[in-house]
Each structure stands twice: as structure tokens, then as C-alpha cells.
């Protein structure tokens, strides 16, 4: 009989100790450490990255809020069999392991964790005593086929809509096959062993269950940090989700296509959440694809300041940068702002479906430095369709002008700020306007990155971070590939260097990455309910 409760395991203990991590954790609300049923909740990366994920923390909170249920967290840290943060229980002792994966590069980490736990990688090789392996998160909703040889079931969409089906299915009588039958019959779950018939899944049943605007306005619907810890990217910040979706429809961005139309959480719910954070921290982080577009962002920031919090935002759309928002953020102690112009060319930005002229960007950058901010991060993409070397040179022109504005506005303060350019390579994502496009020729990318490096070297107080071309090729492959990527993923999980990996699987990578996709796309069996 399948049981979701932890059982004894013969796996040896790992040298990695979670005791210092537990000591630093401050739960916002108390939770029961034990329930009749327990779920292994795994993040396929380090504790630092995983506990920075609001989605991961939201699932943890929701499971613990379910009567008779608890969950224990697992991360990539250490090199022995993974053990839980809460009780040091080994991963293979649980009846079900639910991974949250937001980045394609973590597919390999997921397999590494399974291998270290002694859990068979391929789903067909698992027996009745092996845990069920589930994968949720944004990657599952983009293209679950890549991992379909390894994963027993994919919950598709928002955890709030999926856990009420998943947890009872795990708790009912029956073996693992009975659980998979129950999930396959429910909306919002892709079960490869049940839905795969030859090359095509059963299209009629596969829907992605996202949160509706009405659900987001219901009591308890606001995702917030469940456990505050200094051991994250946000260092003891209490994170609050402001909205979902995005008012823009940029052709390269999955979030604008895959998360539904822009909708925001009620202001009263956000202010109540801020109040709950008081006992555990004085730092807040507001996160969303479009934080500044919440209709009451100014009121929220001012109220947070009044309560004595230091606040920051994940990023702000260029049109949403206002003097009032900047003043509130600066007053709370924030000195860094992130914008995403994506390209230096007005014309190319229009083709991105992001018609924001450089004149508006410069106006907002002047406001930012005039308000006293000293750190500006600008994100750009290269390898875009119809991009030229001149468009890449335009990125340098934008950086130079932003630097001039920084020096002009900060001169009276005697402070010299910093500008960082983060440059990524276009990875054509499923469900975006450019899902059929290819990755740019590596030689062209090398030349354009060299142009940027040479240009930035001439700009004091401007730094550059660029994506690895090899990593971009690998990410593009596993983003768009089907089940035939299993051998490559297994090679990567066993430690094959990236250069050797790209050589060994060159033919498949050439097809997926450098040839334009035609006809029906393999991932187009998912639809949003």
C-alpha cells in the first residue's frame, strides 16, 4: 500500500548539518512539525536559492495549513543522501517527493538529488516501495515533456488549485499506481505513464489551473514568506507577492503569456501581511513581474515606511517609475533599482512589443539618481531576431548616457554610483511570441559579447555580466526538448562536463536549438483553465 508517511531508511547519514540553518529560521506563524501524513518538499538547488523562492515557501505554508498534513524541506546542499531540514529524515523515506522547479538548469539538480537518495531516476524503473516523484513550478507549466521520463506526475498551475486534489489522492488507500490513476483523472495533472500514447499526450484532460482574479481576492490568498532567514538572496526580508501576470506582452517573455492577464492582490491583504511580519523582521521585499503597476503601490510603500520597515522591490517597469514611488523606497533605505530596457534600440524594442523610447528611459534614470539612488541595474537581451551589431552598440550608448545622468545628478552629494549591465542571450520559450525562433549563431554571439566587453571597459563605474553561450545553448535545448532529452539529462546528472555534453548530443541540440520550429509544437497540449 502506498503511504505518504515517512518510513525507515537504510541510507547513510550525510555530513551536511542543517542545525545552523534551523537556528537562523524565524517562522512567521507556528506550524505543527508532524502530521498524520508528510510530504517531502524539495527545491532542486541550494537552501540559499530555494528559501529565496516565494513559490516554494507558499507550498510549504499551504501543506502545513492542510489538516493532518506536514511537509519537510530538502535542498541540494551537501554531497551525501539528501536529508530534511526539519528532522534529518532521508529523502527516500517519504512516499512522495514534490520538487519545485523554476529554472531549467535545475532539471539536472533534481536528478542529482534523486540519485544521491538512491531513488531510480527513470520512472519506469521505480517499484512499489519507491517514492512518487512530482515536479511543479513554472517549468512544469512551460514544457513538462523534457522531464517526462523521470517524473511520475506534474501538477500544472497554482498550488492553491492543485494541493486540494493532490494531498487527498496521496492519503487515500491504494498503491502508487492507484495514486497515479487518481491524478490522471483529475484536471491540472500530467501523468506521463497515463497520458502518453505514442508521441501525443491525451489533449482533452491537460489543463493548467492558474489563480483567477476572484481567487486572488479571497481571504488567505496572498503568498508571503512563511519562514524568514538571513541565509537567502534577500537576507531576512519578508517577501510579499503584489500581483500576477504582466500588463506588457513582450514577445520573449513566458510570464506575460503563461500567467494570464495582469491582476493584483488587494491592498488591505498586503497591509495585513506587513503587520504580521513585525515580530520577525523589519525588512520587506515586494515581488511580481510588475510591482510598480499595483494601483495602490504608493500607499502600500508609505504605510510600510510608517510602520518602520525597510522596503525593496524586485523590479519596476520603466513606465511605472514615479517620483512618489522612488521617494518612498529611498525613505525606507533602498538605494538600488532594477530596470529592463532589453535593448538599446528604440526600433528593436518596438519589435519586442515593448514600445518604450530611450527618451523615457533616460527621463526615469534621471529621476532615480536625483532621488539619491546609487545603484542601477539594467537588463538587456542579445541574439534577438533581426538584431544587428549596431543594436548591440546601442546598448553601450544607453549605458554611457545613463552614466552621464548618474554623474550629473549625484555630483552634489559627492557620491559616485554604480551601473551594472546584465546581458542575457535570448532563449526562445514555449508559449511566447518567439517560441519558434532559434538561438543566434554562437560566433555571432561571441562577437557581440566582445563588443559589449570592450565598450564597457571604457566606462568607469559601469560593470557587465553576461550569460555563457554554452549555457544558453544547453538551456535552450532542455527548454524545448521532449522526452528524448532524457539521455542528455542523465549524462549531465552524472557529472559530464557541459562541453562534452554539447558534443555528445550535438545532433539533437542542432535540431532543437538552431533550426526554426515548424508545424505543431510538442508542448501545445497544455491550456489554461
Stretch-by-stretch model annotation:
Residues 53, 232-268:
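Canonical Radical SAM [4Fe-4S] cluster-binding loop centered on the CxxxCxxC motif
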Residues 1-28, 35, 39-41, 449, ...:
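Radical SAM enzyme core and accessory elements
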Residues 76-201, 430-482, 489-500:
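Glycine-rich beta-alpha loop elements in corrinoid/cobalamin-binding modules
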Residues 56-58, 114, 149-151, 170-171, ...:
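Short secondary-structure boundary/capping segments
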Residues 10-40, 47-48, 192-240:
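N-terminal [4Fe-4S]-dependent radical SAM core
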Residues 248, 295-297, 324-325, 347-352, ...:
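Flexible glycine/acidic-rich beta-alpha junction loops that bind and position SAM and/or redox cofactors
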